[in-house]
């Protein structure tokens, strides 16, 4: 009898995972193409998520709340990768690993509270300095 919980060949499991992942990606692309807004004269080569029109004349300093929120998202999103790696090895790390993870999460929460108090998460307000 096998020690594995799942009675499936690891190569078959990998093939199923890759096929499902590719299918989900293809489905998302097809649904996005069907649901997107189709405008006459739209330029498909122009990025639309940056918050700044690339052809617009410069009229002073750029208000960059979008870029700040995006940078904060990337910074705080990295914690997920780090905590996922910890969760995979949680049984092996024992109490010391749990304390390390708690300190890491505590530091992240302190950073979040600081950013919240500083106004960095407010989209339309000027930041307090």
UniProtKB/Swiss-Prot annotation:
> What is the name attached to this protein's record?
NADH-quinone oxidoreductase subunit A
Cell compartments where the protein resides: Cell inner membrane
Q: Identify the InterPro entries for this entry.
A: NAD(P)H_OxRDtase_bac/plastid, NADH_UbQ/plastoQ_OxRdtase_su3, NDAH_ubi_oxred_su3_sf
As for what it does, the entry says:
NDH-1 shuttles electrons from NADH, via FMN and iron-sulfur (Fe-S) centers, to quinones in the respiratory chain. The immediate electron acceptor for the enzyme in this species is believed to be ubiquinone. Couples the redox reaction to proton translocation (for every two electrons transferred, four hydrogen ions are translocated across the cytoplasmic membrane), and thus conserves the redox energy in a proton gradient.
What Pfam families does this protein's entry cite? Oxidored_q4 (PF00507)
Q: How does it sit in the membrane?
A: Multi-pass membrane protein
Which classification does the entry list for the species? Bacteria, Pseudomonadati, Pseudomonadota, Alphaproteobacteria, Hyphomicrobiales
- TM segment ranges: 14-34, 67-87, 95-115
Organism listed in the record: Rhodopseudomonas palustris (strain HaA2)
What binding partners and quaternary form does the record give? Answer: NDH-1 is composed of 14 different subunits. Subunits NuoA, H, J, K, L, M, N constitute the membrane sector of the complex.
What gene name is given for the protein in this entry? nuoA
Family assignment from sequence similarity: Belongs to the complex I subunit 3 family.
What are its E.C. numbers?
Answer: 7.1.1.-
- What are the record keywords, sorted? Cell inner membrane, Cell membrane, Membrane, NAD, Quinone, Translocase, Transmembrane, Transmembrane helix, Transport, Ubiquinone
Primary location recorded for the protein, binned into one broad class? membrane
Catalytic activity reported = a quinone + NADH + 5 H(+)(in) = a quinol + NAD(+) + 4 H(+)(out)
GO MF entries: NADH dehydrogenase (ubiquinone) activity; NADH:ubiquinone reductase (non-electrogenic) activity; quinone binding
Entry GO terms, CC: NADH dehydrogenase complex; plasma membrane
